């Protein structure tokens, strides 16, 4: 692993763990608080520029979403749900994407962190920016989907396009990054690359032949994988695909969605990656030395989510962490071993060498059809995209110390 030192900004809002999708719902925003508690108790915060994100406004969110949809998210509450019943159907808000107390505020924290991360890169304040509360890749222009309401990733990509000619989006969540792909399916300014389970599995999209349309033809890359993929198999596809994208697309900035539902033993996942295999992806993307945003995403076995995102925070900051977890507020979650590790299991790998070689070859052949490093003069850069009252707030070291045990 490459533990080289870089300037890293880390976004965290202490309120993020207060939001609840519901007692039986697998999405637990509390996991981001667990990560932060480990970051603090490993003393990692000393190596990071810790920033409380400026919360995204409705105007910020409507850069990607319709006014009507964002207005609905702003207005709907558990107490007013019945009045908004027709809107809930229209905007796909219900079971998977429930109405809960503070829904709009949760979205504004998630989106604000990712937009702020892009602004840190644009300003040169950071080489890497982290927002584990982001990564909500299923959200669409006018509807919620797959536990996601506002597409913070698309908002961050738009912000990056102000200063970077080409942006690469990489997704290692077990689910296809359909929402982000849809936003940029017709442009050559953003390339999307998703590694995901394909077949009878949510959201059911991401076929290898789905490569974009019009100007965006060949700028969407889909890597459809089968159940049980392990570290070695994943690496054998990930590294050549990303290397060829870097060579042919030549991105100037990259967003990496680090969904942890691709880990072994995830409550909703079907892959068999260890912490080592998952973090290999982070390390490999980091090695290209591009301005880089890392966001969260899926991950439903929360003790493993916290372990891996903490380890990857250390990796991004150039700090190797002790395998023995420090004492922290959530120590009981990590028994019986109390280690900073997630191991693969004995799950069968349905990805044969022949299958992996065939999809890798097809993807690389598609990339060869790209005109080398697209000319940006042909396509207008989006207008200025700034926060209202966009003053970032650095957390004082004393405040962080309050979280230490």
From Swiss-Prot:
The gene is clr6. This is Histone deacetylase clr6. Belongs to the histone deacetylase family. HD type 1 subfamily. It catalyses: N(6)-acetyl-L-lysyl-[histone] + H2O = L-lysyl-[histone] + acetate. The keyword Nucleotide-binding does not apply. Its EC number is 3.5.1.98. Keywords: Chromatin regulator, Hydrolase, Nucleus, Repressor, Transcription, Transcription regulation. It comes from the Eukaryota. It comes from Schizosaccharomyces pombe (strain 972 / ATCC 24843). Responsible for the deacetylation of lysine residues on the N-terminal part of the core histones (H2A, H2B, H3 and H4). Histone deacetylation gives a tag for epigenetic repression and plays an important role in transcriptional regulation, cell cycle progression and developmental events. Histone deacetylases act via the formation of large multiprotein complexes. Has a role in chromatin assembly and chromosome segregation. Residues 6-318 are annotated as: Histone deacetylase. Pfam families: Hist_deacetyl. One of its GO terms (biological process) is heterochromatin formation. The active site is at residue 138. Heterotetramer of alp13, clr6, prw1 and pst2. Its main location: nucleus. GO terms for molecular function: histone deacetylase activity; histone H3K14 deacetylase activity, hydrolytic mechanism; histone H3K9 deacetylase activity, hydrolytic mechanism; histone H4K12 deacetylase activity, hydrolytic mechanism; histone H4K16 deacetylase activity, hydrolytic mechanism; histone H4K5 deacetylase activity, hydrolytic mechanism; histone H4K8 deacetylase activity, hydrolytic mechanism; protein lysine deacetylase activity. InterPro entries: HDAC_PDAC (IPR050284), His_deacetylse (IPR000286), His_deacetylse_1 (IPR003084), His_deacetylse_dom (IPR023801), His_deacetylse_dom_sf (IPR037138), Ureohydrolase_dom_sf (IPR023696). One of its GO terms (cellular component) is Rpd3L complex. It is found in: Nucleus.
């Amino acid at each position: 692993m490459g533990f080289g030192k870089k300037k890293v900004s880390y976004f965290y809002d202490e309120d993020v763990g207060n939001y609840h999708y519901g007692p039986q719902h697998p999405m637990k925003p509390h996991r981001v608080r667990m990560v932060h508690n480990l970051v603090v108790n490993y003393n990692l915060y000393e190596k990071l520029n810790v920033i409380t994100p400026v919360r995204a406004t409705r105007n910020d969110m409507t850069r990607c979403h319709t006014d009507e949809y964002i207005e609905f998210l702003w207005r709907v509450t558990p107490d007013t749900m019945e009045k908004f019943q027709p809107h809930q159907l229209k905007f796909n808000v219900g079971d998977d994407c429930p109405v809960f107390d503070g829904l709009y505020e949760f979205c504004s924290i998630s989106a604000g962190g990712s937009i702020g991360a892009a602004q840190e890169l644009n300003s040169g304040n950071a080489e890497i920016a982290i927002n584990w509360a982001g990564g909500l890749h299923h959200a669409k222009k006018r509807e919620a989907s797959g536990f996601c309401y506002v597409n913070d990733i698309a908002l961050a990509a738009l912000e990056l396009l102000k200063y970077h000619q080409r942006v690469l989006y990489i997704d290692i969540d077990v689910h296809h990054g359909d929402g982000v792909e849809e936003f940029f399916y017709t442009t050559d300014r953003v390339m999307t690359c998703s590694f995901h389970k394909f077949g009878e599995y949510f959201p059911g999209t991401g076929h290898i032949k789905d490569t974009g349309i019009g100007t965006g033809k060949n700028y969407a890359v889909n890597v459809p994988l089968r159940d049980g993929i392990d570290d070695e198999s994943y690496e054998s596809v990930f590294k050549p695909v990303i290397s060829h994208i870097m060579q042919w697309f030549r991105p100037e900035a990259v967003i990496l969605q680090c969904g942890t539902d691709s880990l072994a033993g995830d409550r909703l996942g079907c892959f068999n990656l260890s912490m080592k295999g998952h973090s290999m992806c982070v390390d490999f993307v980091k090695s290209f030395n591009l301005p880089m945003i890392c966001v969260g995403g899926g991950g439903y076995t929360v003790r493993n989510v916290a372990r891996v995102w903490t380890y990857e925070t250390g990796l991004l900051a150039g700090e190797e962490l002790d395998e023995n977890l420090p004492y922290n507020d959530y120590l009981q979650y990590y028994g019986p071993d109390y280690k900073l590790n997630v191991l693969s299991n004995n799950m069968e790998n349905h990805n044969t060498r022949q299958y992996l070689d065939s999809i890798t070859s097809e993807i690389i052949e598609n990339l060869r059809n790209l005109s080398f490093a697209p000319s940006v003069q042909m396509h207008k850069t989006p207008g200025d995209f700034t926060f209202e009252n966009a003053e970032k707030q650095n957390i004082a070291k004393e405040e962080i110390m309050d979280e230490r045990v």
